[in-house]
Amino acid sequence: MLPYSACIVKHFLPSRLYIFAQTLPFPRVLPYNRHMEFKYFKNMLVISGVKPFDLEKCCTCGQAFRWVKNPVHMQAGLFGECGLNDAEASPAFTGVIRGRAVLVMQSDDSLIVTPCAKGEAQLFIDYFDLKRDYSAVEAALAADERLRVCLPGSSGIRVFNQEPFEALISFIISANNN
């Protein structure tokens, strides 16, 4: 039986690349992040324990085109309300998740999503694929010499669980991007 990732690429990659994908050292069952916690503050959701995660890399890597980088002053004060450190904050991004406009910010290993009502955490955890333990996936990729060189520049990127139409349009745009 092929590893999970090889089964996915089987339908999308040319035969030579598919043969290479079969040799990748991905785990058969992708591990889950057991260190993640979330809390609500007013109309904000704070998700902590989401390493490795780099919001800026995720939103600008070309997998989604509905994310806009905001000036740093827009997030001033929000981190203090949640008990987080402004100094470790990355830029904030405005985007659309399942038809909802949201502002997302990161401080160290915490992610802040606003606006968010109580009970909506699962929507954002699923979209950003925060349940998956990407450090275990990166460790499996590091076992391959060819992929090890790519890890420093791509560490922290997570695959967004976009709506199918959004993923299709993002793929078409990135394929036609010069």
Report each predicted region and the residues it spans.
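Short terminal hydrophobic/aromatic SLiMs and anchors at protein ends
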Residues: 1-20, 24, 32-35
